[in-house]
Amino acid sequence: MNDKEFAAEVLTALPYTANDQQVAVVAALARFCAAPPQPERVFVLNGYAGTGKTSLTGALVRTLEARKRRAILMAPTGRAAKVFSANSGGHAAFTIHRKIYRHAFGADAERGGPPMPAENKHRDAVFIVDEASMIGACDERGTSLLDDLIQYVYSGYNCRLILIGDTAQLPPVGEERSPAMNPSVLRGLGLKVTSATLTETARQAADSGILFNATRLRRAMALVAATPKGLTPPVPKLRTAGFDDVTIVEGEDLPEILTGAYDNAENGVADSILITRSNRRAAEYNAGIRGQVLYREEELARGDMLIVSRNHYFTGAKPRGIEFVANGDIVTVEQVYGTEARYGLRFADVRLAFPPP
């Protein structure tokens, strides 16, 4: 594979004319993908909001497909995988857990413990992980998702890994920095790291109020890091006037606006997102939306969407087409048969709809 020809094809697949920084990043990605087999090489792409990271990734995936090169898309959560797939032209995307772990059998399933690693049977594949800043180095069971991901990818012949994220996003719980986006951490795991950062705003996003304020907050974060101890850094002020994608809403109008968003036939519940400053406020808004907008007064109701928080392996008969329930999957409640309290906890007997495998 000629890296210059490959880079030209990626740039052609972009829906706009790339800026100089994007051209340089595409050239680096092309060299990475076109290089002859080398042991354990990883590419880390850090992209600020609005810099064209999503479009660039989609163009890369389409170019790999056109060249008959296998691209495997993954993300930490079901929602992130769904968005990643949509932004990549409908190319299938998996949660990391679903791809790199396998179904446990017999005593292994009954014993629980760390998940069972799957076998990477791919050859010459490029694994692309979006939202990589969410990947933690260690969970409550002492399992490192990052270590397991790396081991899985590089157990396949001539497979390589591209990690895509934004270091300004919150790191995994218990971490000060995202280990997956930290070249020093990756080198400590024995990887040869190539890294690039997109900082220039794409022209088509320059008029976005969301992007404007995200950039302002990013600069404020840099000031906080550079402020000497004992001094108070300036508090950033958000700008809301003059943007088509930012609207100030009075509290009394919020229920009507939320109802309109959730009733939207095209987007609906799945794509309506409310961001709060704390988990407590999130719980309050969730309760209010369920009761006053969706009219769901029960603790758990038909249509509720749930996020799986831990891998589950079936010890008996498996549902058709489902090997195991993966951490990060989004499932939908189809029927609630009953609830009960045991050992100080509440349990529900429900029927769930699972995402396609």
Segments (PLM) and residue ranges:
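Short, conserved phosphate/pyrophosphate- and ester-handling motifs at nucleotide-, phospho-/glycolipid
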Residues: Q22, T77, S278
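Short basic coil micro-motifs at the edges of alpha-helical modules that engage polyanionic partners
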Residues: L14-P15, L73, E297, I322
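Conserved adenine-nucleotide phosphate-binding loops and their immediately adjacent elements
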Residues: N2-Y16, N46
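Conserved helicase motor core of P-loop NTPases
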Residues: D3-F6, V25, L29, Q38-E40, ...
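N-terminal pre-Walker A segment at the start of P-loop NTPase domains
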Residues: V10-L29
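Soluble or luminal CAZymes and related metallo-dependent hydrolases
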Residues: Q21, R141, L145, V249-L254
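ASCE P-loop NTPase helicase motor core
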Residues: V26-A27, R31, P37-P236
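Conserved SAM-binding loop
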Residues: A18, L73, L274
